[in-house]
A protein has these predicted regions:
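Selective transmembrane helix interface/packing segments
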Residues: 1-280
Length: 280
């Protein structure tokens, strides 16, 4: 560790060190914000389902059960982490890490404002789609490493479904690039009447284009923009294996799907990655 710190001290200028420190702080802020959003979504989902079923839902821990997700998270962290005897232990250990890392890596290029993003990549959309598709690898690893029929079948179902809907999601996202081109947004900047503008893959530039024209592309290019948004929303639900596209986790057939053999902290990583991908 000391050698690493000495290397940084001798090779980084104060300006570079400050820039890297700001990136690390920004990443930690995003991680904390997404984690809080995951907790809020989990509580809200449970309360809505409870009221739909004429129940109250979580009510005991905190006012109206607001602290129930924190209690559940603590319970998962304290539970025994069991690894099946015949599992491929290295792959079994790596699978949830691959899934959660890919889910959070997509936030690197997602803008939270005109200038607020970890980095502004000129291929931001391609980066997001590419990294999100890597989550399929972690799911297949989880199913294979468990050395059980049910997780393997669940992982194969999930990977097939995710690959299938990535085509529709990609086409819907490409429509945003076409809309920026029609709005006069070029690769090198924004300006009305951009002439030979060919659109941009930078997500910050797409956000600025809509901000400058004071209207979302969904409404400006109605009904095509609304149709593209609808296709993206449906594909997103299918990509995250949420109802009604939760076939990989069909309880009547495959119990919990590809993470049947996981428990404790490793199971919570799959849970966190699923909700983080939904928010992204």
């Amino acid at each position: 560790m000391s050698d690493f710190l000495n290397y940084l001290n001798s090779n980084l200028t104060p300006g570079q060190a400050g820039a890297y420190l700001w990136v690390v702080i920004y990443i930690l802020i995003i991680f904390a914000a997404v984690s809080v959003a995951v907790i809020a979504m989990n509580w809200l989902e449970r309360k809505i389902l409870a009221h739909m079923q004429v129940r109250l839902g979580p009510m005991r821990v905190g006012p109206h059960g607001l602290l129930q997700p924190f209690a559940d998270a603590l319970k998962l962290l304290l539970k025994e982490d069991i690894i099946p005897a015949n599992a491929d232990k290295l792959v079994f250990w790596m699978a949830p890490l691959v899934v959660v890392i890919t889910a959070f890596t997509t936030y690197i290029v997602i803008p939270f404002g005109p200038t607020h993003a970890v980095t502004d990549m000129n291929i931001g959309i391609l980066f997001m789609l590419g990294v999100a598709s890597l989550g399929t690898l972690g799911i297949i690893m989880a199913g294979w490493a468990s050395n059980s029929h049910y997780p393997l079948l669940g992982s194969l179902r999930s990977s097939a479904q995710m690959v299938s809907y990535e085509v529709a999601m990609g086409m819907a996202v490409v429509s945003a690039v076409l809309m920026t081109s029609l709005s006069g947004v070029g690769v090198y900047g924004i300006g009305p009447g951009g002439g030979d503008a060919i659109g941009t893959l930078s997500m910050i530039e797409i956000v600025r284009a809509q901000m400058n024209q004071h209207v979302w592309f969904i409404f400006k290019f109605f009904p095509l923009g609304l149709a593209a948004f609808g296709i993206f929303a449906i594909a997103m639900v299918a990509e995250t294996n949420r109802a009604p596209f939760d076939l990989p986790e069909a309880e009547s057939e495959l119990t919990a799907g590809f993470h049947t053999e996981y428990s404790g902290f490793r199971w919570s990583l799959f849970f966190l990655a699923e909700y983080a991908a939904m928010i992204a």
